[in-house]
Amino acid sequence: MSVDTYTETTKIDKLLKKPTSHFQLSTTQLYNKILDNNEGVLTELGAVNASTGKYTGRSPKDKFFVSEPSYRDNIDWGEINQPIDEETFLKLYHKVLDYLDKKDELYVFKGYAGSDKDTMLKLTVINELAWHNLFAKNMFIRPESKEEATKIKPNFTIVSAPHFKADPEVDGTKSETFVIISFKHKVILIGGTEYAGEMKKGIFSVMNYLLPMQDIMSMHCSANVGEKGDVALFFGLSGTGKTTLSADPHRKLIGDDEHGWNKNGVFNIEGGCYAKAINLSKEKEPQIFDAIKYGAILENTVVAEDGSVDFEDNRYTENTRAAYPINHIDNIVVPSKAAHPNTIIFLTADAFGVIPPISKLNKDQAMYHFLSGFTSKLAGTERGVTEPEPSFSTCFGAPFFPLHPTVYADLLGELIDLHDVDVYLVNTGWTGGKYGVGRRISLHYTRQMVNQAISGKLKNAEYTKDSTFGLSIPVKIEDVPKTILNPINAWSDKEKYKAQAEDLIQRFEKNFEKFGEKVEHIAEKGSFNK
């Protein structure tokens, strides 16, 4: 053990043994601390609402991985996975530990990430704020008892000091905020931001490194299971309908965001859900609304003096959130794991209006679309700007994957082959024209298409290959108008459709160039018109 490692271990032990380090507090005890410390307010729903200050989302430009000899050759360095040297990290780490040692109170939670016992990550979370500790308790997997928690020897420790501000010139960061992951020292160091999601996504990034090293697929997706044990995975970026479509009263939820896929099947990495709360209503999303009760946390929502919550008010951010234990949802699998997937759904919201509402992908096409991670952003719509912008996020979650994207794509391809998984690309975006001209595909029709896919009814259906993209489109789907299945038929001007489709194909190809020679085999067989 090096001197630095010895010192940091001693400092961590000292923090954990402080009389004012509150260990494994109950929800009620944490509520009392949150309210006594003015960290949040109680709402009429029973949840507490906390403000995250000026950072109402993640700070991807302030996230670093420590460049350490045993790990540096594995990480896909670049704008997303930024390096920081070990010496710089250790100096900052010790400063943060010394800072926390001077705090009147700290909050400690021990738990797990990963509901599969063989690959479960044991965690210690040290928080400056009580509400962050409740967040950790809600989002990670909770031990059965306090006694069990005392026996946990962590594989990874989160040290969270949101009120500690870094000095970039001295500390080697880019701003006052930092999220630094060290695989050698097995720590996630967070400072300068009160956005609690950094803890959740930090551990997800760690699992996205560790699991593939054991030939286990890690995935940014939601998952559910039917009465017959049939499992479906939903991949999709923000705004594609992932949460809405995977919340099905006839299917049990495995998890809403982070999963692994090993030799036994699919398992949830988390013990909670972190749902978007903007415009939330009981009518639209009853499962999520009913989960916001005693024990849950709301982030950055607007709360009146009488405790009522206005979910439509976005004065602080569009990114309002609700964090709650998964057992706040009635319709769940316990424990949070199931068999191998039967169906994978890739969701995209195509604002260009040219991708079919549903198409069946072969393995190569699935790998291509997984690496592309396409959806559309509607930039500047509040000013009447109607030009959609394509958005590509590798693996449907580029900020969270430290290894080269082909590691994940190759694993996915192998698993699709091994378990004969049906993969569908579902467009929840526009038809009959691009945004501003066409119309949004009806949620009712999308649900019907997804339900037919998951039920297996589309497995051996009749398909036609569209001439533009080379995608396999079902000839008919029960209760869905035939006219919308092939997008060219929904456009009155066929030449405009072809021009728009060709433009999108070129954008896909340009995006794929960033992967270089490593993905030539995927582009060769999986891209459009192949």
Swiss-Prot record:
Database matches in Pfam families: PEPCK_ATP
Cofactor(s) essential for the protein: Mn(2+)
Subcellular location: Cytoplasm
Main location: cytoplasm
EC id: 4.1.1.49
Cofactor: record remark: Binds 1 Mn(2+) ion per subunit.
First and last residue of the signal peptide: none
Sequence similarity: Belongs to the phosphoenolpyruvate carboxykinase (ATP) family.
HAMAP family in alphabetical order: PEPCK_ATP
Protein known as: Phosphoenolpyruvate carboxykinase (ATP)
Organism phylogeny: Bacteria, Bacillati, Bacillota, Bacilli, Bacillales
Gene that specifies this protein: pckA
